Curated annotation (Swiss-Prot):
TM spans (from-to): 482-502, 518-538, 567-587, 592-612, 627-647, 737-757, 1147-1167, 1181-1201, 1220-1240, 1259-1279, 1286-1306, 1416-1436
Domain called ABC transmembrane type-2: residue spans: 478-718, 1144-1369
Family: Belongs to the ABC transporter superfamily. ABCG family. PDR (TC 3.A.1.205) subfamily.
Domain ABC transporter: 125-373, 808-1052
Any one of the GO CC terms: membrane
Protein name: ABC transporter G family member 11
Amino acid sequence: MVHNNDGDNNDQEMQEIGINEKRSQFPHISVEESRQEFDSFSNNIEGESKQFGMNRDAESNMAVESEEDFKLRKYFENSNRMHLENGGNEKKMGVSIRNLTVVGLGADASVIADMSTPFYGLVKLFTPSFWTKKTSTFDILHDVTTFCKDGEMVLVLGRPGAGCSTLLRVIANQTASYVSVKGDITYGGIPSKEFEKYRGEPIYTPEEDSHHPTLTVRETLDFALKCKTPGNRLPDETKRSFRDKVFNLLLSMFGIVHQADTIVGNEFIRGLSGGERKRLTITEAMVSSASITCWDCSTRGLDAASAFDYAKSIRIMSDTLHKTTIASFYQASDSIYNVFDKVCVLEKGRCIYFGPVGMAKQYFMSLGFDCEPRKSTPDFLTGVTNPQERIIKKGFEGRTPETSADFEEAWKNSDIYRDQLQEQKEYEELIERTQPKVAFVQEVRDANSKTNFKKSQYTTSFVTQVIALIKRNFALVLNDKFGMYSKYLSVLIQGFVYASLFYNMDTDITGLFTRGGAILSAVIFNAFLSIGEMAMTFYGRRVLQKHKSYALYRPSALHIAQVVTDIPFTAIQVFLFSIIAYFMFGLQYDAGKFFIFCFTLLGASLACTALFRCFGYLCPSMYIAQNISNVFIIFMLTYSGYTIPIPKMHPWFSWFRHINIFTYAFKALMANEFEGLDFNCKESAIPYGPAYQGSEFDAYRICPLGGIEQGSLYFKGDFYMDKTLSFATGEMSQNVIIVYCWWVFFVVCNMFAMEYIDHTSGGYTHKVYKKGKAPKMNDVEEEKQQNAIVAKATSNMKDTLHMDGGIFTWQNIRYTVKVPGGERLLLDNIEGWIKPGQMTALMGSSGAGKTTLLDVLAKRKTLGVVEGDSHLNGRELEIDFERITGYVEQMDVHNPGLTVREALRFSAKLRQEPEVSLEEKFKYVEHVLEMMEMKHLGDALIGTLETGVGISVEERKRLTIGVELVAKPQILFLDEPTSGLDAQSSYNIIKFIRKLADAGMPLVCTIHQPSSVLFEHFDRILLLAKGGKTVYFGDIGEKSKTLTSYFERHGVRPCTESENPAEYILEATGAGVHGKSDVNWPEAWKQSPELADISRELAALKEQGAQQYKPRSDGPAREFSQSTWYQTKEVYKRLNLIWWRDPYYTYGSFVQAALCGLIIGFTFWNLQGSSSDMNQRIFFIFEALMLGILLIFVVMPQLIIQREYFKRDFASKFYSWFPFAISIVVVELPFIVISGTIFFFCSFWTAGLHKTSDDEQTFYFWFIFIIFMFFCVSFGQAVAAVCINMFFAMTLIPLLIVFLFLFCGVMVPPSSIPTFWRGWVYHLNPCRYFMEGIITNILKTVRVECSEEDMAIFTFPKSYNTCQNYTSAFQSYKPSGYVESATLNGEPACGYCIYKNGEEYYETLGWSADNRWRNVGIIIGFFVFNILMVILFVYLTRKGSR
């Protein structure tokens, strides 16, 4: 945590080679000065604490009081001293690396997967030439030798692809993603292999932020602290006091004290700002108490002042706590750079410099490179590897290194290289003598809690981890109150629907069968609710992977906590359903039976939840998991014992009932209900009718139920269970226990799956390309060609670019949002303009409102109230404003199924003017690819970071910019275009934007951490303070003199020649974590003469714009560039390509259809013409209906995911809502036809339906099934279109599915459906028309011939002489079925078969074969209605909430 890493009583030898050497070698870094500087820093915080403390409520007083006493340096030193005095040890673990080579998969090792991939795999399998072909590889890092002593800080610099992130991951011992890792890595003398057991001691913090969005900052950090509270705390220090102390310390360090009770949020949930979320990520990493920390671009999203504050904090912690710190920053100012001790420069995987930061610049200048004035040292160090950026001194032409291999050779021939090797050797010898690993190992063991194993990788015991995770999981559920309440509301509604359908069932033959349906439906209901948990397993994977690497907890502990959390919430769900359903069903009014009912349903729900989670943990894709779960549901439902009695099951699948949760739950619930329950069949005993009412006939009537003796008109439920279902009521307890055993079994399986299966990439992204399009990796010749392409593109920029912009002005812009308790003003009377030929920078500290202002100016805001005026060329903004403006947003939202080139071409085709030819558009795309240094990525899949397949974070940012540039916008808004980019890429981007401005494009660009070189490209600046108030708007001036003179005029110290003006003004205005200023800058601006000049200039510019830029002559403004037909065609082509490239989704549905078809077909194998087989035909169709309904769950995520990309495209006016809505439906149809046809061929003939069907019936079966599948898919899409997210969809869909399958006429015959529901729901249910159409189709030509076991055989009074005489009245009363003469125990008898043909069966349901094609038309009508609903709700939700 803090104190257990520390120590200041260093060995004398360590002092000589360690700290003292650092002071002498690096005069620009002084530990004492750093400490003194932090004293001032602490005092500033104390002042802020007192200022804000007056406004804090009682709940947060503790945080403020701790903050007032906060002194970081003193805290660390005192904590360390007290820790050592109480018997603690030091964890001083430096890192030494020799000859490190990391090998990764080559770009051509894998290609973009699509529907042809399986066939290509088969060709490779049977082609001998592929058998010996090795997978291509390349060196991500090549022969790197470096080291970092404890207490030192090493900065790793390099361009994208240089290997910086890989070096950090390898140092953090995260090597699973690579083909091989060669070389020697030791940690304080411990080899890397042995050091693996100390997980969490070396940590890697990636640049992206992964947190649970619904937790607050306090809950996030308090949980991490609970998992990392050491056992060797100070005397009398409780766990609670320790956590409070560290919590307040870290929040104060990073300036998020006042955000402690704010939820973290994400791109969809409002919470912390991007910068605040980044500080939380840093804080959480510090809680891990690692001795070796690797920070990968941890300042991304922070302003320059906050980034510097962060670096200083890390510096002081490294000095006082002897932490080993290695960090990689894409953009680092000189201030940050000088905080570090050493710098390692990488290029194409090769180390081209490693040594003191103070000598790096001079080293490269000695090679013949020159540095521009005011250019920061980090920019210079990475810039020398870029042919377009580096400057060669006179006389060195042709003598400087060109390729990465040249640079590496020059480095290894240098004196500094030899000095560093010698220093590393001496450090390793020192480690060998002092053996710091002994103290380290002892300290790790002592830090483990007393209840934990001493050799455990984790600080706290397994039980402690589980308790902490349980509390966190409860917080996750309770913080999402809307989701929780909506789920329980759904349960209540569904409970009433189920209960009313099976309301007050009678104890007769009809009630006998409906009781089974009611009980099975209760099991199915809870199973459907459990399906949603499978999707949730995919959303927290990156957080789990991060916490696992930090050694916070075992993944299996997380699963146990989830299970414990499930129990109360699932119990509430089951109880709410049961209290309604049980008593309205009319089940036995017995308290014991009621609680057994609840207890069994609870076990079944928990077991199903564990089963579906197991699929989620085992499968890499949600679509694979969903398809597998659908097959299992069909299997479980079929072999539950209801649709097919056990005696009727075929041997090849009957084994499944022994491992079926549904079977045991159903058997237990049936035994619970039927034991001791009396049934009567007097009304339905055969024969019946007015002629048989006398008691003298009772002895000659028989219940239509197998096994009951003639004359017995009453029977026990136990008898029915035993004779008909082959269930034993005495096995109820055993079945309940088995249900819970399955739950425990799947819980254990999930624990093992979470421990040993990891589908995340660990932050590593692997690129995949189109087949045959992969470039060579880290190849010298390829490097030279790429440099030549970029050089040519740069030189031709002026000839290619030509923009026709205008003057854009804004005045008195105010933006207000509603917050609890009132309103909040986020922008306060902002004024300004942009015009051709000028670049305007928008700057301010984190939370100042920069992004908010851009959203308002770009007309992207959909929430809140915007006031003020915006004009383009003196006129009001027209409908085409969003299309003719480019907005590079901070979030990089791209469709992962496309390649980089395809994404750019799509933007160019739909946003450039229709008069521009396709050839010209594509030519411009290629030029932008070259300019953005993405030519080699053109055929690379964009992919996602979560899967680890696709382009990197930095490359996504470049793509975001490229997508806007290829549209040739007239105005360009850029929100953090260089965030996450290295210095050289940032330089190229800003240089490119400068060219756009010079070509006539007006633009404004927010920027957090501009170097002085980048800052010089801007002409004007709009500087904002917190609260959205203007600090300054005006010219920057030559060498920033105009800007700096404004601040100097208000009493700020002069800006030096070597200082970065951007950092200077942020410091002056009090930006940063703990920055403050004595000047009220917004008030100063209001009183300044510059503001008066601005007002006059605005009026003049509006008039100038109206005169200079005449109104368009080509007709009214168009919202979209292309016609609706063209948009639809292009959107459909794109979606079709995405579907083609998702074999998990497409082939998953095919395989699901095949498996379900085979399972159902062989389950109902070769059906005959008996009456029992008639029922089997009905359940065959019911299973097919369930397959269609389960498809709903599969298609919903696709629409919700694609809709997010649509919203981003719609905001930029790529295309309208109609093309997307119609395309997302149509793109599914061909795949549905294939899936339905596969199911048809796998099931129709195996079930023997062809024997009673002609060609027309066979075609009808296929056709109506395909149409029904169309309905199901479109229904799922319509529901998804209504819902705001997947969670809400998974809550709503079970409620709607209830109406589909319960009211279709199978679970309950139409005549038995309550009048209320039968009057409207039954007739509005598409499944009812599907069942009527397809059942009448397959039964209309079936002739029933009852088998002996299906025949009801009864004797008759001898006075009637013949069976015909005795049953004549019965046959006239009930015309269906037939009676024939039989014998019973050697006596003459009657045999009654309930049906003589299939037509008699469906006529009892009120169905007719004459309605078959009418039903097809009705289902098509429902399909069209669903499409209209998709279109409507895509339209209503086309604008995201922002």
